[in-house]
Amino acid sequence: MTVTESRPTSTRPAGQPVLEASGVTMRFGGLLAVNDVSLTVHEGEIVGLIGPNGAGKTTFFNCLTGLYKPTSGQVRFAGTPRKPPRASKKTSDLEAVPVQPLEPLTPLPPKPRAVVRAGMARTFQNIRLFANMTALENVMVGRYCRTSSAALTSVLRGPKFRREEAATRVRAQELLDFVGLGKSTEHLARNMPYGDQRRLEIARALATDPKLILLDEPTAGMNPQETRQASDLIFKIRDSGLSVVVIEHDMRFIFNLCDRVLCLVRGEGLVEGTPDEVQSDPRVIEAYIGTGEDDDEDEDEGTDAPQRPQDEAGEEETP
């Protein structure tokens, strides 16, 4: 079974490792959700994570990003945060952001805030926007982890706070331009089309200045046109120098997008390789591609996958 088509290739040479997960295991009581899974991601690389429903893909993401503390194993990261652009310089291209050299791989603490500050960001299966905030305000929220104003300075709104607030607003607008939402700045998140809400989540994640972004089912519930636009955006993110890891059930999407693919089955790594290698492996065909399982089910929660919102986006605070 072959689903790959021609795909844009990166003009950047393969970089050094930015993420190294070794022997990650996660138990919930007597349930072994992830068992001895390892993954290395390099600079400027797109890696896909596939597997049947309940394979442990999102649980593995949660271990990488500090939401779960792995029962055993280690997650090491080499990210040094990108330097934000000066507020006076407006650009819609992330390539204009100067990047510091990566530090050596070091263990990541299992704390979401520490992971974000180290340079790793993520989105979730279900949309988690602030429904009653504008698109610009949602992205600004993501940016505040890069500000240094203390609580008292924020309350008094002193000169330092006002400078950082202005820079945050400029950067948020740049990121909206980058993801194609530059004209939606003042739109409330709850009133935006479903595909735009997904883009807005990505913009908010990019506001943390990551070196690596993890996307959990970014095309869930999208129509074919929105899926193509999501693919183009991910290539654009990759070409700006970031690394990307994507969980997705859409095989055509994942095999046309990724440089490498890891297939999980029952919490264990089954096959890792290029898209051509993975999609032609008999074990993958038997375990996932050829099963005929409903790809729209939520794999870890045992409920339906996120659907298009009818009235408003979910309003939850991200870590």
Please tell me what each predicted stretch does.
Residues 2-319:
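Glycine-rich phosphate-binding loops of nucleotide-dependent enzymes
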